């Protein structure tokens, strides 16, 4: 047994991130990921070791020996798959290859992670990859030990899928534009679990000297681009990617607000400090193994729900309209049939400043689609599982004294959810 107490301890006194093992849960069917993210953020930048089949809901299995690349969004601990957007992979050597031949072996003793940071040595291209993140943007640092045709694969077709056919057909449209030699922007629409639109801006700290577009299969619409750089062995390439649901301008605003320069160590430290601030809210006594178990679970609980609204509060809602969140932030990734029992009660205790935002997000989505989210993702509805557990989440928040939302609006969407038939609610009409 171990003791537990909430604290107001200054984060500088103890580094609680030392007790987080981001690889826990990443074995077969644990469906967690080891990469870098911020609490409740849009971005989760993490390695991909596979993408096809239920085993790869998070795109990573600890025992795998090949890394496909690094994607910028991930689901954490779910039993369904989606996201896995914008795969990038540093490569060297022959540029024109089959789309799946840029993957690399990696030694497990050269892979490491801590909250907000991930690193690995990629054996085949001879590159050290490092990842960190802000809430809406990822920042990568690649050190090319071998600079022969130093390049980056940008794969916009990629995404976790149930089978090979879906993997090669999930992208419905893909538009890209090189705004200058260092900036790529784009818009991708895809459909795996939910219909998703995302916009992005990708910037490099040095100019692209050549691009190669790989051939696409008949069912593919997502582009695969090889961007090549003039580099010497030992030099670093920095790349940052910001995303938005609203448009390229939204992605640019997110990048400018959060990662305006190329200070990798600064972003990494800010990510560490934010995680430590949250983790320091609970102090436990016990063995190091018990602390690792506890703080890793605490960490995983704070990865979602995810703020998908831009830094200025705008987001794409369930009707594909661009609107501004009522309280400044809109959250999605609500696996409510899982989280209503323990996670949401936990949030009311440990992150009370987030609770009103969660409730307002549920209410806003309900007012658009006609009923409370069942399993909300990327601002849309997946219609996954039965019942509607958002009711208890809102009721609990109100019962515990949270008043940062309109109680009458909340009651009306609860009533509408429970008493009105909605043809969009799959095959379980309430009569």
List the predicted regions and their residue ranges:
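C-terminal motif of bacterial Sec signal peptides marking the signal peptidase cleavage site
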Residues: 2-3
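Accessory carbohydrate-recognition regions in carbohydrate-active enzymes
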Residues: 9-392, 398-431
């Amino acid at each position: 047994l171990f003791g537990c107490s909430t604290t107001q301890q200054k984060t500088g006194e103890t580094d609680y991130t030392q007790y987080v093992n981001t690889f826990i849960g990443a074995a077969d069917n644990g469906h967690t990921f080891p990469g870098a993210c911020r609490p409740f953020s849009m971005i989760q930048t993490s390695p991909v070791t596979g993408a096809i089949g239920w085993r790869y809901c998070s795109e990573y299995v600890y025992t795998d020996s090949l890394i496909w690349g690094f994607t910028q969004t991930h689901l954490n601990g779910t039993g369904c798959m989606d996201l896995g957007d914008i795969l990038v992979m540093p490569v060297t050597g022959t540029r024109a290859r089959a789309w799946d031949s840029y993957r690399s072996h990696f030694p497990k003793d050269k892979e490491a992670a801590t909250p907000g940071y991930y690193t690995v040595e990629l054996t085949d291209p001879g590159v050290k990859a490092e990842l960190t993140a802000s809430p809406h943007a990822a920042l990568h640092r690649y050190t090319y030990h071998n600079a022969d045709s130093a390049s980056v694969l940008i794969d916009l077709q990629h995404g976790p899928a149930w089978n090979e056919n879906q993997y090669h057909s999930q992208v419905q449209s893909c538009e890209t534009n090189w705004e200058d030699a260092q900036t790529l922007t784009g818009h991708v629409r895809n459909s795996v679990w939910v219909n998703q639109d995302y916009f992005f801006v990708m910037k490099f700290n040095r100019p692209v000297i050549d691009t190669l577009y790989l051939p696409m299969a008949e069912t593919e619409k997502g582009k695969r681009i090889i961007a090549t750089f003039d580099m010497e062995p030992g030099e670093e390439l920095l790349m940052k990617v910001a995303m938005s649901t609203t448009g390229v301008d939204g992605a640019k605003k997110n990048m400018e607000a959060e990662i305006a320069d190329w200070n990798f160590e600064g972003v990494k430290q800010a990510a560490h400090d934010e995680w430590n601030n949250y983790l320091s809210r609970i102090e436990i006594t016990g063995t190091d193994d018990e602390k690792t178990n506890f703080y890793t679970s605490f960490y995983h609980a704070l990865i979602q729900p995810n703020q998908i609204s831009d830094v200025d509060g705008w987001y794409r809602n369930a009707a594909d309209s661009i609107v501004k969140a009522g309280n400044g932030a809109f959250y999605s990734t609500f696996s409510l049939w899982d989280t209503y029992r323990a996670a949401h009660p936990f949030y009311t205790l440990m992150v009370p400043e987030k609770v009103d935002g969660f409730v307002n997000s549920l209410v806003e989505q309900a007012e658009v689609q006609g009923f409370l989210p069942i399993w909300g993702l990327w601002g849309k509805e997946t219609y996954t599982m039965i019942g509607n557990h958002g009711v208890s989440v809102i009721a609990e928040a109100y019962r515990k004294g949270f008043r940062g939302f309109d109680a009458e609006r909340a009651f009306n969407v609860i009533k509408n959810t429970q008493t009105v038939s909605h043809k969009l609610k799959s095959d379980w009409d309430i009569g």
